[in-house]
Amino acid sequence: MTQPQASKSPTQVEVAIIGAGPAGLMAAEVLSNAGVAVHVFDAMPSVGRKFLLAGIGGLNLTHSEPLDIFSTRYFEQKAHFSSVLPAWGATQCIAWAKQLGIDTFVGTSGRVFPKDMKAAPLLRAWQQRLRSQRVQFHMRQRWTGWDKDGALHFESANSGASVVGIAAAKQAEQAVVARCTVLALGGGSWKKLGSDGAWVPWLRARGIQVADLLPSNCGFDVGVARLISASSTLETTPEPGLKASLKPALGEHTGWSQHFIDRFAGQPFKQVSITHTASNFSRQGEFVATSTGLEGSLIYAVSAALRSDILQNGSATITLDLLPHMSAERVLQEVNHPRGSRSLSSHLDSRLKLHGAKLGILYELLGKEAMHHSATLAAAIKSLPVTLTATRPIDEAISSAGGVRLDAVDAHYQLTEIPGVFCAGEMLDWEAPTGGYLLTAVMATGRLAGQGALAYLRA
C-alpha cells in the first residue's frame, strides 16, 4: 500500500506498540518495567475497549484447570501453548491481578473472575501502573501501514483531537520511526472496537504469511428446519433412543419459522448436550436460540470444528440431547404415559419438564404430526439432529481464527521477514474457546513479544 507522506518530519521513538488491548498493554508493561520509553498507539478514544466489552456479565480472566489440559484448548496450536503457558498461565495471571489490587475467585465451572466481576477496575489499575512507568498513550491514532520510507504511518481518527505526547495535532497524518515495533492489532471481530483486520494486506505485502481471518466463538445459522423419519414414514416404531431414526428433510424451508423466531429467539437451552460426530465432540452445557440459528457457550466450544465442517462440506450437523440426565427408555416411558385430557405440551412439561425453547424446537423440527408419534418424539428428545449452514459474520464473533502464521515469527513473535517488528495477541494464528483461554493467551503472547522486543533493543 502506497502511503501519503506525513506533513512533518517523522517522530522518533524507542518502542511503538500499536494496539492498546491486553496484548499491547502486557508488552508495554514488560518493556516499561525495564526502563524502556514506550509509546502506545490506538485508533480508539481510550484503551481496552474490547477488554471492557468482555467484562460485561463478568470478566473471565483465566481458567483454573491443570496446564496439561489447559493447553489442549488451543486446538492445532496446543503444542505451541504447552511451552508458553508455564511462564504465563492461570497462576501468574491471578498473581498479577492481585498485584493490581484485584482479588479473584474460582467459579463452579473452574473459570477465574475478579471478585467484583468487573473489568473496569482492573483496567484502570493497569493503566495507572503503566502511566507511572512513563508509558505514553496516543489515542485516536489509526495505523495505516508503513510509508515508502519504512516509517509507521498514522492517521488521526479525529483530526481535531489533542494527541498526548506527540502533537496537539490538527494535522491528520503522522509518521513515526521506532527502533522496535510491537503490533497488537487484534483479529477481525468487533470492528467498531478497533479489531478490523485492516492490517492483513499490509503485512502480506511485506511477505508475511497470514492465514485468512475467520469467525471463532461465533453463532451459526440453521439450515433445514424440518425432519422426517429415516424410513420416510411415521408408521414404524424404532427402538427407544435409536439415533438414526431421524434425518434432515431436504426441500423444506430453511431457517427458523417466523413463529419460532417470535416465540423463542433469545431463549436459553439449559442442561442439554451437543454431539458433533465428525469431531468426536460431546459435551453438556447451555446455549441460546437466535433469530437465525444458535449461539452461546456450548456452541462456541465446538465452533472451530463446526466451521471447518461447513467449509469442507457445505453444512454441519449437530445432535441435541434435550434430556441428557434421562435414559432413552425412561423418556419413551414418560412420553407413552397416559395423558388423559391434557394437551401434549402440558403432558411433556408435566412428565419430562420439557417446555420453552426445548419444546419449541421439537415442534419446529418434527411438525405436529410427528410430535404425536411417541417413538419418533422420544427418539428426537434424545437425539435431535440440527443442520447448520453458515457461521455468523466475523464482526459478530467473540474472536477470530487465522492471522500471522506462527512459522512466520520466532519464539518471541518477531517477524522473520521484518526484524524489530513483533506481533502479539489475537492477530497471531491461533484460536481457543471462551472460558478464560483467550485472555490468558493474549496476555502470554504480549508478554513474550515484550521480552523479545527488550532483547532486540539490548542486542
Q: Language-model features: where?
A:
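N-terminal Rossmann-like FAD-binding beta1-loop-alpha1 element of flavoenzymes
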Residues: 13-40, 450-454
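Predominantly flavin-linked oxidoreductase catalytic cores and closely associated redox partners
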Residues: 121, 129-350
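A conserved FAD-binding loop/helix module that cradles the flavin
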Residues: 189-202, 206, 429-458
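A conserved beta-strand/loop capping segment in the N-terminal third of enzymes
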Residues: 52-122
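Residue-level recognition of phosphate/Mg2+-coordinating polar/acidic sites
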Residues: 33-34, 46, 67-69, 86, ...
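Glycine-rich FAD pyrophosphate-binding loop
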Residues: 32-56
